[in-house]
Amino acid sequence: LVWLVAKNKEEIIKDVSIDDDAIKGDPDAPVTIVEFSDYQCPFCATFYKNILPQIQEQYIDTGIAKLVYRDFPLGGHAHAQKAAEASECAGEQGKFWEYHDILFENQDDWETVGTGKFKEYAGTLELDSETFDACLDGGEMADEVRADFLAGRNYGVTGTPYFFIDGRPLSGAQPFSEFSALIDKCVEGGDSCLIDL
């Protein structure tokens, strides 16, 4: 495992696509963090609750970095695919991040029941329920979610959460210091963030 992590750090993908996925922060921020995540993954929830707030405060809110969320629902999580579709349906009504947040904040509540809760959350966010239900029930975002998943596979993503910081992979809900060290290197400019830390 140690060898795989070390090897992974050397595999740099300079052009990780952000597709048309949701962006948190200034779209023109100099550093791009692409997150491949699964709403039902407990480690993804840990990242959301414990690490993302620090990244948000220090890098996103200050215009240094932007976060792009891409779906990577794992097969072992029964409701992950539909949760991802639900967030994309909410995004169609301009509330992707609000829905993203409600899914992670309430992961324990919906992970065994799924769709009924997804519709309830849409109501909580005052989304147009008819439009949301049609989107979710009709699988309108299934291809979008699948495209993210396949892109992640092509980039070597095997689990969640998985990040690319200006193309540099970082796997798992790492401590904030790991993100900070890599982002700071990228802020220095040029290829500095492509060098081993």
Which residue ranges define each predicted feature?
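Hydrophobic single-pass membrane-insertion segments
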Residues: 1-11
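Short active-site neighborhood of thiol/selenol oxidoreductases, capturing the structured segment around
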Residues: 27-48, 67-68
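Thiol-based oxidoreductase modules, predominantly thioredoxin-like and allied folds used
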Residues: 64-80, 139
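Short, internal strand/loop/helix patches
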Residues: 87-107, 114, 128
